[in-house]
Regions:
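N-terminal beta1-alpha1 cap of cysteine-dependent amidohydrolase-like domains
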Residues: 1-9, 17-232
Length: 232
């Protein structure tokens, strides 16, 4: 429906979860049928898989990736590209092994190691040519990539010299992702004003009236996001 109404060049659809879980099966079946309906040249599958490092043997293990791709292939989905999530670089030997057992080209195995900022990930993927390979795979006609503005933004964010301390007082601070959009908004505002924002998470339920001043007076600002109930 989106493709018919907006008529975009590309629609990106994420299917989360774990391959093999019953919850994701209807969605995986839907994207399998999508390639059949739209044609192979119009659909590209990119599989993001964890490649864990085992400290005992000091090696990266490819079995989880091999297993998840095997599960995908069993329901009729062959990934075109595999993005390997890891806390360290994926060397050429590991890439060749994954390519061999997952039946993809070695160039189609891309490393996505942990980065200091999520905004650095597109640059990492670009340096390995993932964007160019996807464009070629979908037979799209594109002009020259303009990535310098993004690169400048990332470098600017990395080199912020001034800082500001903001208290985020909330009910769900034990799970910071509950305030992910708020945290990102603070980060963006700080970048715009050339400041690195340090967020100090404070549990609203444990903050008593007697200690409010002592815990907050050293900070530059206070943000209390919306919540539910009288505890906020």
């Amino acid at each position: 429906r989106l493709a018919e109404q907006v008529q975009p060049d590309v629609v990106i659809t994420e299917v989360g979860g774990t391959v093999g879980d019953i919850e994701s099966l209807p969605f995986l079946e839907a994207i399998r049928q999508l390639r059949k309906d739209l044609g192979r040249e119009n659909v590209c599958y990119i599989h993001v898989s964890l490649v864990p490092f085992i400290s005992g043997s000091e090696e990266l293990k490819t079995k989880p990736t091999q297993h998840s791709v095997k599960e995908l292939r069993s329901i009729g989905i062959q990934p075109d590209f595999i993005v390997c999530r890891s806390d360290r670089p994926i060397d050429a030997g590991i890439r060749r092994k994954i390519a061999l057992f997952c039946d993809v080209d070695p160039k189609a195995v891309v490393s996505a190691e942990d980065a200091p900022s999520i905004y650095e990930v597109p640059l990492t993927l670009h340096e390995q040519g993932l964007d160019a390979m996807v464009i070629e795979r979908l037979e799209l006609e594109c002009g020259e990539l303009e990535i310098e503005e993004w690169r400048t933004f990332v470098e600017h964010r990395r080199t912020l010299s001034r800082s500001v301390n903001i208290a985020l007082v909330g009910k769900y601070v034990a799970l910071p992702d509950a305030y992910l959009s708020v945290n990102e908004a603070l980060d963006h505002a700080g970048i715009f004003h050339d400041h690195k924002v340090s967020v100090h998470w404070l549990d609203a339920e444990s903050l008593s009236p007697e200690e409010v001043e002592s815990r907050l007076k050293a900070l530059h600002g206070i943000l209390v996001p919306g919540g539910f109930g009288v505890r906020g």
